[in-house]
Structure formats: structure tokens, C-alpha cells
């Protein structure tokens, strides 16, 4: 059995059409058919059910495909690891982060990093915590910047910084002149929050629970800036971090004296998984940056 046969098999299994698969592989149809026949002969079982030039995987084919895909993944990752070691100061970091960190923090962080490491580039993904963690576990992301998470193997997470959360109200709100309030003072308000599954929403829900508040939630969105816009329109109030670049001309932020309103942000990676030298360099840079 040859490696080339596995590549041919994987392509044919994906396209399920001999002519299209052969064209994709830049070989003739007879050459592809002979290669698959030799593979089936080597395994001792047919891998496809055939109907003319259209084919589909049978029971044996599905089992074998799972193993081939795993082998291909290991092979690809092995090549990438070797290339990364050959060029430790060049490469790409796949970084995921929360929407609320994308206004200035992540751009500023990457900007300062690239002043020292101009040959390292980034693939960036923004989303909520659950989505980021799934992509981290699948290998699509090297690192994530997100709020504190429950301990979960094999995810490694360490704290970087804490940020205060404020109550944002329209400028004409009765509480707008106050410097600070307790959460209980706004228990009867209409709230504009992020959707369930977002790290900030999880933190806010915990604050409501601590204050024994059942919030009247009017709107749920995906962006902190959108929530702030709804507050400016007088549609409710919200609990958000003090985002740089946020238009605060029509809204007022108020500090919460009780309970303590803050969230913890950290960096996450997969323990035991190979981390390319460039990703490791960025990870250590971030940790050092926030420990100063």
C-alpha cells in the first residue's frame, strides 16, 4: 500500500464520482480506478458501492476513511511542526478572542508585538467563549483570549487581567447623575444583554444571581456596541465593560458599589498539544505584557 493510494481514496470518498475525482487529482480515470482496486485488494474488502461512475462508501469504506483522515491530519501536523521549528521567527498564529476585546485591546496588543516580531502574522477569529473553546479543542485555534472558564481538560487557562463592569444608562435616566449604585437599585429596569453563551452574559447572570435579581430582559444581542446603541435609544440599560472607542455621547456609565462588578480575562491553549514556536512566542509575550 502506498501513501498516494490513501490520498486518492480520500479524494474519491469526498467527491463520490470517479470522473470528478480523477480530474481533481490530475490523473486519468483508469489510473484512479486501478489505484483504488489495488487498495481494496490489499485490504481484502471493497470500500465503495458502485453505480456507473457514481460511487458511495460502504460500511468498510466509512471505517477506513475515519482512519485515513486521522493519519492525514497527523501527517499534516507533523509537516507543520517541522516547518515551524525550521523557521522559529516566522509563521502564523491562529488567535481567537471575544468580541468585546476587538475594539482596541487586541489590535493594540498585536501592534506592539509585531514591532518586535514583524515576520509573525495572525489569523484572527472573534466569537463567544463556547465557540472559541470548541475551535481551540479542534485545533483550528492556537490560543484564545477569553473570560475565566470552568476547569476542563485538556484546556489550560491562566489569568491575565481583570476589568470592571459598569451600568450604562441613557443620559436622561434618573440615575445618570449618580457616581455609583448597587445592583439592587436597578432590579426593576429593562435590560439589554448579550445572548446566552457569551462570556460577558455568563458573568452578568452570576451578578444577578448574587444580588437575587430576576432581570427583565428586553433585548439580547451579539455585540456590546449594539447593546450600547440600544441604551442610547432609551430602550433599556446594560452592564458592560468600559470599551474604548464606544460612543458614549448619549449614555452614562455608573460604577456598581455592590456586588463587585468585574470579569477576569485570560489566555487559553491546549495542554500537551504542540504549539508552534511563533504561537509560543506570542503566548509568552502576552503573559509578560500583563504581568508588568
From Swiss-Prot:
Keywords: DNA-binding, Transcription, Transcription regulation. Residues 1-58 form the HTH lysR-type domain. GO terms for cellular component: cytosol. One of its GO terms (biological process) is regulation of DNA-templated transcription. Residues 18-37 bind DNA. Belongs to the LysR transcriptional regulatory family. PROSITE patterns: HTH_LYSR. This is Uncharacterized HTH-type transcriptional regulator YybE. GO terms for molecular function: DNA-binding transcription factor activity; sequence-specific DNA binding. InterPro entries: HTH-type_LysR_regulators, LysR_subst-bd, Tscrpt_reg_HTH_LysR, WH-like_DNA-bd_sf, WH_DNA-bd_sf.
Amino acid at each position: 500500500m502506498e501513501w498516494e493510494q490513501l490520498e486518492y481514496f480520500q479524494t474519491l470518498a469526498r467527491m463520490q464520482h470517479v470522473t470528478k475525482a480523477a480530474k481533481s487529482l490530475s490523473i486519468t480515470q483508469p489510473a484512479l480506478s486501478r489505484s483504488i482496486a489495488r487498495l481494496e485488494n490489499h485490504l481484502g474488502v471493497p470500500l465503495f458501492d458502485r453505480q456507473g461512475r457514481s460511487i458511495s462508501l460502504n460500511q468498510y469504506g466509512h471505517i477506513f476513511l475515519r482512519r485515513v483522515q486521522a493519519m492525514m491530519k497527523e501527517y499534516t501536523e507533523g509537516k507543520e511542526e517541522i516547518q515551524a521549528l525550521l523557521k522559529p521567527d516566522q509563521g502564523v498564529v491562529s488567535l481567537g478572542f471575544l468580541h468585546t476585546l476587538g475594539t482596541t485591546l487586541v489590535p493594540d496588543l498585536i501592534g506592539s508585538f509585531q514591532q518586535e516580531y514583524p515576520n509573525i502574522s495572525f489569523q484572527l477569529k472573534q466569537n463567544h467563549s463556547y465557540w472559541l473553546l470548541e475551535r481551540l479543542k479542534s485545533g483550528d485555534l492556537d490560543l484564545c483570549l477569553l473570560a475565566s472558564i470552568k476547569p476542563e481538560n485538556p484546556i489550560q487557562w491562566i489569568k491575565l487581567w481583570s476589568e470592571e463592569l459598569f451600568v450604562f444608562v441613557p443620559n436622561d435616566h434618573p440615575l445618570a447623575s449618580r457616581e455609583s449604585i448597587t445592583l439592587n437599585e436597578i432590579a426593576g429596569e429593562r435590560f439589554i444583554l448579550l445572548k446566552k453563551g457569551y462570556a460577558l452574559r455568563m458573568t452578568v447572570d452570576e451578578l444577578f444571581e448574587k444580588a437575587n435579581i430576576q432581570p427583565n430582559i428586553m433585548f439580547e444581542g451579539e455585540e456590546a456596541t449594539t447593546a450600547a446603541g440600544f441604551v442610547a435609544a432609551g430602550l433599556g440599560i446594560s452592564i458592560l465593560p468600559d470599551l474604548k472607542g464606544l460612543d458614549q455621547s448619549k449614555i452614562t456609565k455608573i460604577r456598581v458599589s455592590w456586588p463587585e462588578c468585574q470579569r477576569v480575562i485570560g489566555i487559553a491553549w491546549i495542554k500537551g498539544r504542540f504549539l508552534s514556536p511563533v504561537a509560543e512566542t506570542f503566548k509568552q509575550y502576552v503573559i509578560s505584557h500583563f504581568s508588568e
